[in-house]
Amino acid sequence: MARIGDGGDLLKCSFCGKSQKQVKKLIAGPGVYICDECIDLCNEIIEEELADADDVKLDELPKPAEIREFLEGYVIGQDTAKRTLAVAVYNHYKRIQAGEKGRDSRCEPVELTKSNILMLGPTGCGKTYLAQTLATMLNVPFAIADATALTEAGYVGEDVENILLKLIQAADYDVKRAETGIIYIDEVDKIARKSENPSITRDVSGEGVQQALLKILEGTQASVPPQGGRKHPHQEFIQIDTTNVLFIVAGAFAGLEKIIYERVGKRGLGFGAEVRSKAEIDTTDHFADVMPEDLIKFGLIPEFIGRLPVVASVTNLDKESLVKILSEPKNALVKQYIRLFEMDGVELEFTDDALEAIADQAIHRGTGARGLRAIMEEVLLPVMYDIPSRDDVAKVVVTKETVQDNVLPTIVPRKPSRSERRDKSA
């Protein structure tokens, strides 16, 4: 654009006026020039505006009742767990916002500490799905990790920092966004130490992993290898602060109910003690009476339990709940398969007793809600194989006999159209 200097051949930035000799790069456009410094400044302004736009105002943060209501649309039952999670998540993100806005000068400075969550309950009862649904609602990065793959640093297996890499990847390598995400660590009961007493031999996949997780659970500046795997001194690291990352750790904790019952039963010993029969102890929610001492006896170390102050337990799903899971949620399995059949121009129908039979099979197999899809696949496999090759099927009806006795679903033929009838008569 404008030229300066005696020779008239020295270009300058159209925005800041610096000459091409004063900057590293000068980029030409149709009638204008812009320098690298102005480009950097523009990028900084855009990033600041995007960051401001991403900040959720406190009055926009969903209230616990709204979080629970959202979960109701996807997860059947587990009311106590929903309430516990809703309050814990609300308080967690309220704490983050309080830190970003700074302390109110009218109040005494109070540091709000993080409350990670421990979820207990049998397999197939909705622990993972609850956490996934929460992350979807809040629109935050979410990562799932398997505790059984982790080992103490220096041994074969994954370092605990690889959990953080999954979160960073879920945030498209936006570290700032990842720092307010949710990490779900499953199968945490499998890293319990082998006995209640500390071992003199090194337990690299049990107690060693618990020790390694302590810092990132509490909040630390972690160095994460960008490609995963083991650390080595000649690679660059991604730095991430885990102070505002919410950790939800979960496990089935098979055998913990016996430890709880053993402790609760001891209350009946001695004069004047309250005697409780087995029938009086809540067996529908095995973990309703869990205490830190039970978890320590199970094999979790006290320091690990101390970093998981919120405990949410899920219960075994009964037949009624499994039937509701099949048909009521927004993405229920029955609705999914009806949609699949619609894409082939066929109507799919399940009778009420067919849904009950599917629920009975899931209970018999002990797989909970996770096993419902496998049963549906087994029941519908023959017709899903045949129907795409046929054009004479209008409707498929799945009955109780289809599920229990391996009878083929009832096929309702399609009535021929007028043109087809005309062609046949001709």
From Swiss-Prot:
Residues 1-54 form the ClpX-type ZB domain. One of its GO terms (cellular component) is HslUV protease complex. GO terms for molecular function: ATP binding; ATP hydrolysis activity; ATP-dependent protein folding chaperone; protein dimerization activity; unfolded protein binding; zinc ion binding. Pfam families: AAA_2, ClpB_D2-small, zf-C4_ClpX. Zn(2+) binds at residues 13, 16, 35, 38. ATP binds at residues 122-129. The keyword Metal-binding applies. Keywords: ATP-binding, Chaperone, Metal-binding, Nucleotide-binding, Zinc. GO terms for biological process: cell division; proteolysis involved in protein catabolic process. Belongs to the ClpX chaperone family. ATP-dependent specificity component of the Clp protease. It directs the protease to specific substrates. Can perform chaperone functions in the absence of ClpP. Component of the ClpX-ClpP complex. Forms a hexameric ring that, in the presence of ATP, binds to fourteen ClpP subunits assembled into a disk-like structure with a central cavity, resembling the structure of eukaryotic proteasomes. This is ATP-dependent Clp protease ATP-binding subunit ClpX. It comes from Mycobacterium tuberculosis (strain CDC 1551 / Oshkosh).
